[in-house]
């Protein structure tokens, strides 16, 4: 990890937390994609996929929870800016070989700051919702690998994580 305290934009010269002033930044299209996964017992994954979980449709509830979380990120993360999102989606891919449910969130806006935190928050809350809805049948679940996959737009430009297959 490289960098110095001078590069931490959420700290002032005295090291105190502050909200970054983005007022002079250009308004540009922004997009971020984040992923994570919930590892579980094979029977739990099957119950989720088949819609047989006692608490209801896990994927539908987790999708809505993730989208709501993206919209409310500024209320959850203290120094995040309130953004006018133009798009937020949360999708799931079962991974039977890994006994996991993969989560991917995509968030977009046109604004003066990026939407990385909104995408990461969407994945995190979707994962926690899955955990909450399934904990009665599987206490071994594990939330894993929440990470930013890509970001587009803004002064720092585009970025893509290189992931091995």
Curated annotation (Swiss-Prot):
Q: What does this protein do?
A: Catalyzes the conversion of (8S)-3',8-cyclo-7,8-dihydroguanosine 5'-triphosphate to cyclic pyranopterin monophosphate (cPMP).
Identify this protein by name: Cyclic pyranopterin monophosphate synthase
- Give the residues annotated as active site: 132
What binding partners and quaternary form does the record give?
A: Homohexamer; trimer of dimers.
What InterPro entries has UniProt attached to this entry?
A: MoaC, MoaC_bact/euk, MoaC_sf, MoCo_biosynth_MoaA/MoaC, Mopterin_CF_biosynth-C_dom
The UniProt record gives the binding positions of substrate as 79-81, 117-118
Under Pfam families, the record lists:
MoaC
GO MF annotation terms: cyclic pyranopterin monophosphate synthase activity
Report the sequence similarity comment from the record: Belongs to the MoaC family.
Q: Which Gene3D superfamilies match?
A: Molybdopterin cofactor biosynthesis C (MoaC) domain
């Amino acid at each position: 990890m490289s960098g110095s305290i001078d590069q931490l934009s959420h700290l002032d010269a005295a090291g105190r937390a502050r909200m970054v002033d983005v007022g002079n930044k250009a308004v540009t299209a922004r997009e971020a994609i984040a992923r994570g996964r919930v590892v579980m017992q094979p029977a739990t994954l099957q119950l989720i996929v088949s819609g047989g979980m006692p608490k209801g449709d896990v994927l539908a509830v987790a999708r809505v929870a993730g989208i709501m979380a993206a919209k409310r990120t500024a209320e959850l993360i203290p120094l995040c800016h309130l953004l006018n999102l133009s798009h937020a989606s949360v999708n799931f891919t079962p991974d039977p070989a890994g006994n996991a449910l993969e989560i991917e969130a995509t968030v977009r806006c046109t604004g003066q700051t990026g939407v990385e935190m909104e995408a990461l928050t969407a994945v995190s809350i979707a994962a926690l919702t899955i955990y909450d809805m399934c904990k009665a049948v599987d206490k071994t679940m594990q939330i894993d690998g929440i990470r930013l996959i890509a970001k587009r737009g803004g002064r720092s430009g585009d970025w893509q994580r290189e992931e091995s297959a």
